[in-house]
């Protein structure tokens, strides 16, 4: 297909989870044709929920762009695990992508929290480059960058859990 799925925060969790379920042909993916594949996945502060321990793909995921703040505690940058139940953020997922040679671009935003979920407009160049090179041209271009830029979007409406849930 020519479909690139993209999401931010809960939407990023949704697109990452959708691709994970599809690659593993779980019951959640049964509604799609057997040969269906996404052309690409773009995640702004996303994660994957696994009920079986470490994230494992039965087939390689579509080219994936991940952007995540290293200090994100709302959608955890690394992981949260309880026995076999785990919630794996971009900082942990990229290690799996690297280990298995998947096609990905990962931008770690040093010291940033969940505000990276709202960075779609300020990271447009990264997105277009990924779509052009990894998706349209089909090149396996791996990028892993640590971004330390005070000019990255720190928009309104991005709150911590404490700010969201305190009275």
Predicted regions and their residues:
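Short beta-strand/loop motif that positions the catalytic acidic residue
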Residues: 66-68, 72
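Hydrophobic anchor at the start of a short beta-strand
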Residues: 3, 64, 104
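Primarily recognizes the serine-hydrolase "nucleophile elbow" in alpha/beta-hydrolase
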Residues: 1-60
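Conserved alpha/beta-hydrolase "acid-adjacent" motif
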Residues: 73-89
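C-terminal catalytic histidine-bearing segment of alpha/beta-hydrolase fold enzymes
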Residues: 95-167
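Extracytoplasmic/secreted cell-surface and envelope-processing proteins
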Residues: 50-53, 74-76, 116-117
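Glycine-rich, phosphate-binding/catalytic loops in enzymes
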Residues: 21-24, 59, 82-86, 125
